[in-house]
Amino acid sequence: VFYLKRLSLFLFLLSLSYSQSAYFSAGLTARYGSGFQSSIEIGDTTRNSYVFREHTLDITAGYGNFSIWSNFEFSSPPRIGPDHLGLRKLRMMWESDYLSVSAGDLYGQFGRGLALNLWESQGIDWDSSLRGIWLTTRPNEKLTVDIVSGNSAGGRHLPIGPGVDPRIRDFSEDATVSALLLSVDNILPNLSIGLYGVDVDAFKPWFGKMQNLFGDVETVDSVNVRTRSFSPGFFVEYFGRDYDLYVEVMKRSLEIFDTDSLYSTPSFEWIYYERENKGWGGYASVSYYPGKLGLTLEYKNYFFDDSHPDIRTKLPYRLGRLAPIMNGPTAFKEHSAVLMRRTPHIMDFEDEVGIQAEVNLNVSDDLFLIFNYAQSSRHTGFRDVNYIDGYDGWEKVETESLLWFSDNEMFYPFKEFYGEFNYHYSPLNLDIRLMAARSSEIVESYVEIINELSYWENHTQEQLDWKKRDLYTLPTELTLSLPSGHGLTLYWEHQWEDYNDRNYLVYRDLSSSEIDSVTTDEILTVPYYYRYVALNLSKPSRYSAGFVYDFASGIKTGSPQNTDPANDSWLEEILRNSGVDMTNKWFGVQGSLYLTPATIFNVFYGSLQGGLKCDSGVCVYVPGIEDAFTVTITSNF
């Protein structure tokens, strides 16, 4: 704290002394929350105390060509991620017409980020920034050279499951990154190109078992294994009068050291790892915007890993996975609607090919329309086969074309339609926003087993099981501007989910390839319904007050929530005594007050639902808080 005071005083005096060319700004965010966290394990109704304290201070100052940015954090603990007390981020930058140098904590990307994308999202405890130096030189008007070198030490969270605390970062990585980018602007009129190479020398956590020097298998919590990758690539960008074109292609070569010492499952089975692995990625987009129409087409094709399910599912940390600094475009819509945010598409950056098309149409000054379509799948699928010749293992199946997606459930297909209607009704000064989305996706697992039967010659037993989620969501938002200067916003959202479980068991005659008999052929569908409502009254730059209501027809863990009156908050007690059935219902009240034009005080009391929270395709489970009291203060000066 003493250091912070001295730094703030120094920067303030600096800004006074050199007011003609100096600048200084700061932003403070302080959060406190307390409540209870319910267990997410099936059949467990335990509630544990949940408290978080997060305080961050961003300071930016500069003089002439020099600037400095720092971030202080005092969290013990934060809502998600590790504790931190003191200086967390620091970056110094000097820039001229021909040279710029940044040292410290670095953010930025090459191209669209397929090989290098340095960014941070504290809400999901994601940090792929580098601590090092970024040098940019411009020898002439067209050529730019970027040299980047530093260390990345971001962390990852395990998928939610038994024994996993979602608030704690499970693994941290230690990677040394060296990168070079050569870009040429207007090599031809309106045409720019870039060539790059990114080298990552990392120590990655391995979670499982390992063989010691005596040949015995011993359990370890986490072992760091060295990997090294090199990713060369290029991009081309063209700007037309009313259209843009962009194409980026790269490849990755990965080497895993000491593969023979790795043991990955508790059974007596070795999982073989190739010492070297090669993959590639590509992204293209076309934008067309003639007048009131905007059209964007995107294509992604990421194929870095085709590991079989033992490696994909039994190892929470696959050694062959992408480095955190590699984060290309998602090419699907990331929604702002509350319920749709809880059921996102979980993208596989290592094996996914797909498209996205979006149309924006400004029909008039009062009417604006959006239409979006996205579809994708993996390149590879697997069958678990057991042949009478002795082979027992995984059989890989590829799509008909590595350049296009498939509808076959084996390849985990995803499909979504989305439409949005925005209209301003002038006589009532009413803004209307209507949304609709329909999506379908294979979730959890796809299993296909083929057994050759020794007791029934020339026949196989084939078993198929998959789980598919179908979602239909209708969000609506109405905002009414009142004569008094107040604004009244009503938001509600309905979502219907069909959770489908397919079971299929047949016997096939190999000589004719025909099915002899069908033992089981059924799809078990479990329907769910969700509802979210929020009402808010506000006066711009003064205050706001609101009420939220959340409902689920069923809980996938099997245990209904909010059924015990002994656990009621005072708000829930009032509602229950008024005759409201509180089963699987959550309520909250919220308010905000502008203490000054730049300082906002927010308070919430009630229950906050947890779930997957995603940013740029990276998803982390953030737990909810029941009977919560949270306070947030935000100030800029």
Label for each model-derived stretch:
Residues 19-108, 114-117, 129-149, 166, ...:
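Beta-barrel outer-membrane channel/assembly domains of diderm bacteria
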Residues 120-122, 162-172, 181, 220-223:
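Flexible, glycine/proline-enriched loop segments at strand-loop-helix junctions
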Residues 3-16:
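Sec-dependent N-terminal signal peptides
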Residues 52-54, 188, 197, 225-637:
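Exposed, low-structure sequence patches enriched in small/polar residues
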Residues 205-209, 221-223:
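Generic multipass alpha-helical transmembrane bundles of integral membrane proteins
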Residues 109-111, 154, 202, 439:
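Conserved radical SAM core fold
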Residues 111-113, 117, 153-156, 160-161:
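Periplasmic-side early beta-strands and strand-to-turn transitions of outer-membrane beta-barrels
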